[in-house]
């Protein structure tokens, strides 16, 4: 868990050792040089639960960075897509955004679906369909690109894209099905660990 400080003022607190945490520094920064400090705590509410089968280690295990965003922007995008080709896009935007457009692009760069709408209370929900989609599976992980563009009254303020797949995951009569086909999952209990750097693992460590 961590507290974030900027120029001697506390910005926020996060208590989760395995997920990212984001903090809005806007009202704490000033022109020129700023001091950003992270206060790391050794223990948290979940320490004893997390230590059932791996080492107790504390500290920052992944990257820390500062970035800027436009005042009017896309806050979040979520897409759900099933094997029938139907998809739903949920986009959250700031209040200055007046229009949201979404395009679905296939692997050949062709636009196979398009929708647009004006946000209501900072949110847009768009539904569409892609005819005969290439389905995602572990064996053939076919992906499409969702491009989301937000505009104010005149100009595009931000555009982002994410990759996604059409698939349906369900459990019927105790059997896990992906796109209607039974799937058997085998796994191993593995924790990210480097003998010298602890929880700080490189891409090479992950591949190995």
Residue ranges of model-derived segments:
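Short glycine/proline/serine/threonine-rich loop/turn segments at secondary-structure transition edges
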Residues: 29-33, 130-143
């Amino acid at each position: 868990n961590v507290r974030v400080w900027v120029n001697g003022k506390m910005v926020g607190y996060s208590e989760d050792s395995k997920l990212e945490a984001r903090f809005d520094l806007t009202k704490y920064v000033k022109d020129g040089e700023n001091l950003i400090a992270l206060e790391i705590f050794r223990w948290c509410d979940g320490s004893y639960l997390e230590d059932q089968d791996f080492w107790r280690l504390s500290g920052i295990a992944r990257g820390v960075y500062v970035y800027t965003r436009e005042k009017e922007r896309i806050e979040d995008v979520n897409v759900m897509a099933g094997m029938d080709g139907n998809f739903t896009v949920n986009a959250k935007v700031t209040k200055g955004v007046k229009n949201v457009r979404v395009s679905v692009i296939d692997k050949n760069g062709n636009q196979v679906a398009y929708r647009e709408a004006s946000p209501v209370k900072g949110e847009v929900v768009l539904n569409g369909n892609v005819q005969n989609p290439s389905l995602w599976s572990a064996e053939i992980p076919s992906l499409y690109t969702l491009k989301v563009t937000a505009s104010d009254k005149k100009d595009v303020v931000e555009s982002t894209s994410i990759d996604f797949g059409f698939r349906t995951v369900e459990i019927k009569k105790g059997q896990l099905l992906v796109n209607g086909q039974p799937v058997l999952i085998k796994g191993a209990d593995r924790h990210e660990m480097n003998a010298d750097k602890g929880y700080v693992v490189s891409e090479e460590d992950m591949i190995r």
